[in-house]
Amino acid sequence: QDLSLRASEAGATITHNIPKHLIISGNYTLLYSIFHNIVDNAINYVEQANISIQLTNQDPSNLYFSITDNGQGVPAEALAHIFERFYRVDKGRSRKAGGTGLGLSIVKHAVIFHGGNITALNRQEGGLEYQFSLARRSR
């Protein structure tokens, strides 16, 4: 809810296909941080961001998600590092947007804690895509 308001204030839009009845088991704070930190980055670094949150697949063991934005993406050599603590792709721009460089590291550890994996890739049409899985039953 707070992300929708923040997105609206920043001129960004968020769409999703997450069913209202979907239950994700786990640590609420960590689960929230996964979605919040990825979406917050898009709002901070993409002018008039279009952000899409999709449940792309599910099976008895896992839920699979994709979060995309319409920004410029990141340099290919930076993709391998964006989940590292304190890593910033563009230090000058990052300083203006604020933050500590911990958001995506927190995301990665929260996904792992919930039995999943996460990757980030540049989309052919521009922007970033985060693909991640979460175990249906986590610790």
Predicted regions and their residues:
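Short conserved segment of the HATPase_c
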Residues: 74-88
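Short alpha-helical Gxxx[C/S/T] motif in the catalytic ATP-binding
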Residues: 103, 107
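Short beta-strand/loop element within the Bergerat-fold HATPase_c
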Residues: 50-61
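Conserved catalytic submotifs in the C-terminal HATPase_c
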Residues: 8, 13-23, 58
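Conserved glycine-rich
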Residues: 49, 115-116
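Acidic ATP/Mg2+-coordinating residue in the GHKL
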Residues: 69
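Short helix-loop "hinge" at the ATP-lid/N-box region of the Bergerat-fold HATPase_c
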Residues: 42-43
